[in-house]
Amino acid sequence: MNHRPKKRFGQNFLQDRQVVDGIFAAADLQPEDRVLEIGPGLGALTDRLLPEVARLHVIEIDRDLGAGLQARDEDKLVVHLGDALKLDWTALLTDPPYKLIANLPYNISSQIVFKILDHRHLFSRLVLMFQQEVGERLCAGPGSKNYGILSVLCQVWFDIRRVLRVPPGAFYPPPKVHSAVLCFDALAQPRIVVEDQQFFRRVVKAAFAQRRKTLRNSLTGAGLGFDGLEVSLLDAGIDPGRRAETLSLEEFGKLAQLIQPHFV
């Protein structure tokens, strides 16, 4: 298929067979598996996945590419035309669990991750391509310069590991950055107790909003300060003068629990 990549959709089509095979291997697909692919593009991954699974849903925003996918005479293939950020995944994926496999458009990859977190009950495993820098952030631990919002939020719910490094030449057109494929395995139980996911996310975002500031200043600046904040932090064993990047998942859990009663 002759198709000119569209910059507005962040299209960099995967064309390296070894990378496709590596993604396929990481997915560990079984004949009964149901899979969601976001951004199938020219179909390099789609062609590899389709013969091996019970059902393959694909979400494609480019109607030209979507028409080509819809023209395939494949009962197992379900094509959803539209923006993955706007479509209702719960309505589309009615018989979970699914495996999510995608070469994500880099301009929306972080937004897609937040949507995945909101729909994590739908998925047992994710195998996702990211810009290398984003991949490093997702895998980073406390004390690392790459440790941040995505690290904390994803590691609460998933085991994450890098399975492939991918050079620009694996794509057409080649991006200006290197890429990484990560595998996320859903945990049976989160690593910490999260009573209110949205409030927990709010606290984590506030703590990292200004990385060079202390927790005391970051939380207050984000509207999460209250009388007695410092005492509450100290009682929880958290120095108010620390920075967010030094906190463990457990400490973020404590932080959310001690702040939330003041904002109910």
UniProtKB/Swiss-Prot annotation:
Q: What does the record give as the function of this protein?
A: Specifically dimethylates two adjacent adenosines (A1518 and A1519) in the loop of a conserved hairpin near the 3'-end of 16S rRNA in the 30S particle. May play a critical role in biogenesis of 30S subunits.
Q: Which GO terms describe its cellular component?
A: cytosol
Key words, A-Z: Cytoplasm, Methyltransferase, RNA-binding, rRNA processing, S-adenosyl-L-methionine, Transferase
Organism classification: Bacteria, Pseudomonadati, Thermodesulfobacteriota, Desulfuromonadia, Desulfuromonadales
| Protein residues bound to S-adenosyl-L-methionine | 12, 14, 39, 60, 83, 103
The record's family statement is:
Belongs to the class I-like SAM-binding methyltransferase superfamily. rRNA adenine N(6)-methyltransferase family. RsmA subfamily.
| The enzyme's E.C. designation | 2.1.1.182
What NCBIfam families does the annotation carry?
ksgA
- Kindly list the GO molecular function terms attached to this UniProt entry: 16S rRNA (adenine(1518)-N(6)/adenine(1519)-N(6))-dimethyltransferase activity; RNA binding
What is this enzyme's catalytic activity, as reactions? adenosine(1518)/adenosine(1519) in 16S rRNA + 4 S-adenosyl-L-methionine = N(6)-dimethyladenosine(1518)/N(6)-dimethyladenosine(1519) in 16S rRNA + 4 S-adenosyl-L-homocysteine + 4 H(+)
Domain of life where this protein originates:
Bacteria
- Name the chain's protein: Ribosomal RNA small subunit methyltransferase A
**Keyword Transferase appears in the UniProt entry:** yes
Intracellular or extracellular location(s): Cytoplasm
Cystine residue pairs: none
Q: Looking at the keywords, is Ligase present?
A: no
